[in-house]
Every structure is written in structure tokens, then in C-alpha cells.
Amino acid sequence: MANIRKANISDAYSCAEIVHSWVQATSWMPNRFTLAELESLIEERMPNREIWVVGDPIFAYLSFDRPNNSIAALYSKNPGQGHGRQLINHIKSHSSFLQLWSHSFNSKAHKFYMREGFVTKEFNQLGADGIPEIRFEWKR
């Protein structure tokens, strides 16, 4: 597996590219932000979140809000290669409880989270993008 490291400000563009590509390829996801806007959003969150990346160049990243034990984002250029699991396991190794919200239409992500030990807790809460979401939890 590739090495995991904490992201720095110069990684924001690569992380934004991964999200932007996913949005472009996902028919149900509204395209609300340009690549430059996504980069700025990630940069703005860096001081308040732990952002972890895999690869050089970066091919997966996870944004973690430690005070809330919340995974705020998990994106991979090539899902199914084990990089999401690697990032989740990294966060699990330092936590006894995790939570996250996932778009209700993202059934592939739901299957992944359930394989990783997460269970569903809440359904159909509207996210900031107007799409219903499901909250998942994991406990050690």
C-alpha cells in the first residue's frame, strides 16, 4: 500500500481535482463549484481539519473533523484499489468512535462503509447541497 501522510496547503489542488472529477462523473450530484472554488474550500478547511492523503501524486484523500469524530470527505481517483480502506483504517487506529454523512444515492459508498464496520443511524437528512444523506457510525 502507498504511504499515508498529512496533507499540506500545496495538496489542496490535487484533492480538489479528485472531488471535481467525481462530481463530473456522478449524474445525481449537482456541479456547484468550479475546480478553483473546490481548491479554496479545501484550503479554508485545512486549519480546522486533519486532511490525510495517499500517493504521490495523490490518488485519495480523507478530511477528518476530530472534535466531532466526523469524516467529512473521502474521495479516491480509482475506487476499489484499497486506498479508501487504508485511510479509514488510519483514522480508526486513533479513534474509538467515528461518524459520517453519505449521500443517499451513493450506494457504492454505503456498501464500502458497511464492509468497514459502519452502521446506519439516520436517514434522509438534507445535506448542504440539497441531497438527502444517511449518517453512519463506527464504534470500536
Model-derived regions, located:
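Conserved beta-strand in the GNAT
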Residues: 53-66, 70-75
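Conserved catalytic-core motifs of GNAT/GCN5-like acyltransferases
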Residues: 101-103, 119-135
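A short helix-loop-beta-strand connector motif used in the catalytic cores of GNAT acetyltransferases and
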Residues: 40-53, 70
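Conserved GNAT acetyl-CoA-binding A-motif
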Residues: 93-106
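A short, internal acetyl-CoA/4′-phosphopantetheine-binding micro-motif in the GNAT/acyltransferase core
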Residues: 69-82, 102-103
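Conserved GNAT-fold acetyl-CoA-binding loop/helix
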Residues: 17-42
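Conserved acetyl-CoA-binding loop-helix of GNAT-fold acetyltransferases
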Residues: 80-93, 111, 115
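A short beta-loop-alpha structural element at the N-terminal edge
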Residues: 2-17
